[in-house]
Curated annotation (Swiss-Prot):
UniProt KW Chloroplast keyword: no
HAMAP family per record: CH10
Source organism: Alkaliphilus oremlandii (strain OhILAs) (Clostridium oremlandii (strain OhILAs))
Name this protein carries in UniProt: Co-chaperonin GroES
Gene Ontology MF terms: ATP binding; metal ion binding; protein folding chaperone; protein-folding chaperone binding; unfolded protein binding
Subcellular location as annotated: Cytoplasm
Function noted in UniProt: Together with the chaperonin GroEL, plays an essential role in assisting protein folding. The GroEL-GroES system forms a nano-cage that allows encapsulation of the non-native substrate proteins and provides a physical environment optimized to promote and accelerate protein folding. GroES binds to the apical surface of the GroEL ring, thereby capping the opening of the GroEL channel.
Amino acid sequence: MNIKPLGDRVVIKRVEAEETTKSGIVLPGSAKEQPQLAEVMAVGPGGVIEGKEVVMEVKVGDKVIFSKYAGTEVKFDGVEYTILKQSDILAVVE
């Protein structure tokens, strides 16, 4: 991947949502909710943002939970990614 985020931004790739419920019902694409779990694909350098030093706390390969309506969705080489600010990441899943 050749997307290089700037500042405190992070590029993530969403983890696919379940297509079948626990009771066995198959969900059509339109009924599936966008997952809030993703893998970090690229991390910006951080630095001074609006007068405050920002240290990047996530790294490539981390699994993260992020705010539901955060970021900008982009398609690159046929793959969908989301670019968001580190502050929109709520937790790292270990």
